[in-house]
Amino acid sequence: MAASHALKPILELLPEELPGEGYRRAQIAHWLYAKGARDFSEMTDLPKALREALAREWRLSEFSLVQAFPSQDGSVKYLFTLLDGKKTEAVYMPYENRKTVCLSTMVGCPAGCTFCATGALGFGRNLTAAEILDQLLTIAYHQGLSPREIRNVVLMGMGEPLLNLRNVLKAVRIMLHKKALALSPRRVTLSTVGIPKGIYRLAEEDLGVRLALSLHAPDDETRRKIIPTAHRYPIAEIMEAVRHYHAKTKRRVTFEYTLLKGVNDHLWQARLLAKLLKGLSAHVNLIPFNPWEGAPVVGTPRAGVLAFAEELKRLGVPTSIRWSRGQDVGAACGQLALKVPRPLTLTPLPGGAGR
């Protein structure tokens, strides 16, 4: 069946909201989230009449085209064409002890961070909960996995999740639902540039997911140079919200910090960062800048990255360096820009919506 906006997105529904009687809903949820069915005809323990009725009313996929770009390090970037023709991206990252996906929450991003290729695209639109979830389901299908074999989700792709909070919360609830993806809350990380109102709301929802703050500078003056929209929310206001989130959820907060040469990589800034985080259960993720065409900034050399990390550790701040994966296909942190990597060959996936 061809993709059609006339069909309703079944991935928008919690398991208890799925069509059919109680036990039929459980069967449909099992097919969607445990077996990864991509067509209603695959749901062979449902009556044929029900399968046909589902196919007439609902769609299983939110994409008209999916393309995959494998990296030499084993990660894979996915480019999704949505039903309205707009595009977004996600990344699959297999590790020895876990399989992780980095999902997008928007087409483009309104934050405009200077180091981020997505920000240079500007804002397209919010993704629906179904479009967020289907990134994971489609990646699992492509990798020959059950969706439940992907046990780590980071909402760190395109977009600012807290500016699409309604749809993001719906998607996360389905990820955590025992009859859906059954993810542990501590295996879901939501990354934000720092929207205080959204952080408070996330705390009140009490989902228990991990929070990552894209801080990138310990002072407002420097941060405004890196994040043009940072003038709306002073660091003190953001930190007050973050401390509330930590107090409410008891979850350690991660602080993302992309190091830019001569901008935010001075050792005095490391000391100021340590002072800012004092008394908070926090972990700093230092991110070496991943270059992209037209970027207005330059990354800190490796020696500078290591020196900044050592200064933070000396001051008692738990710190790690995230050496990004997928750089050769534009899949690394800050590189998602809807670019088609060359000379790698596209890998179209079967079908689209209503397969």
From Swiss-Prot:
InterPro entries: Aldolase_TIM, Methyltransferase_A, RlmN_N, RNA_MTrfase_RlmN, rRNA_lsu_MTrfase_RlmN/Cfr, rSAM. Binds 1 [4Fe-4S] cluster. The cluster is coordinated with 3 cysteines and an exchangeable S-adenosyl-L-methionine. The keyword Methyltransferase applies. It comes from Thermus thermophilus (strain ATCC 27634 / DSM 579 / HB8). GO terms for molecular function: 4 iron, 4 sulfur cluster binding; metal ion binding; rRNA (adenine(2503)-C2-)-methyltransferase activity; rRNA binding; tRNA (adenine(37)-C2)-methyltransferase activity; tRNA binding. It catalyses: adenosine(2503) in 23S rRNA + 2 reduced [2Fe-2S]-[ferredoxin] + 2 S-adenosyl-L-methionine = 2-methyladenosine(2503) in 23S rRNA + 5'-deoxyadenosine + L-methionine + 2 oxidized [2Fe-2S]-[ferredoxin] + S-adenosyl-L-homocysteine; adenosine(37) in tRNA + 2 reduced [2Fe-2S]-[ferredoxin] + 2 S-adenosyl-L-methionine = 2-methyladenosine(37) in tRNA + 5'-deoxyadenosine + L-methionine + 2 oxidized [2Fe-2S]-[ferredoxin] + S-adenosyl-L-homocysteine. S-adenosyl-L-methionine binds at G159, E160, S191, S214, L215, H216, N290. Coiled coil: none annotated. One of its GO terms (biological process) is rRNA base methylation. It is found in: Cytoplasm. Keywords: 4Fe-4S, Cytoplasm, Disulfide bond, Iron, Iron-sulfur, Metal-binding, Methyltransferase, rRNA processing, S-adenosyl-L-methionine, Transferase, tRNA processing. Residues 95-322 form the Radical SAM core domain. This is Probable dual-specificity RNA methyltransferase RlmN.
